[in-house]
Amino acid sequence: AKALTCSDLSNESIQLLSNLHDNPSEAFGNYNDEHAILILQLYQQCPTASSFATEISSVFNQKKQEILLQAASTSFDEQLERYCVLGLAGQQLSQAQVNEILSSQQVDGGWSTDYDLSRSTTYVHPTALALCALIKSQQNGGLLP
């Protein structure tokens, strides 16, 4: 995934990055890996980017039920994914859990965007990455009310 900076937050990039819709053409029918990972990168760098936060918040709120339903399904059972969903359910995602999620996605200094079965214990569903970023932002006093 290409690293973006706060100055890259044009309306076009906001719309692009906020697309969390399922993409059946991708392997395993995953949500868009690159978008979710870029969202996480940008939240790390630009937690107060208000227009970006507003757009992502809007998309997230529209998708909340759908995401929670997916989280209850047997196909959505990675432990780190559940951390994010539990945070959505009103429980707190600790900084240690956030750090664990971030570190598990670091591969050779970059960000993994592939579903690697050999790393299935540390793989985090791309939508969960976006949710973790949202939860972290919420804890930092931004994004969600």
Residue ranges and their predicted role:
Residues 17-21, 59-68, 98-102:
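Buried hydrophobic core positions in alpha-solenoid tandem helical repeats
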Residues 1-14, 25-49, 70-96, 116-142:
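An alpha-helical repeat/solenoid feature that recognizes helix-turn-helix modules
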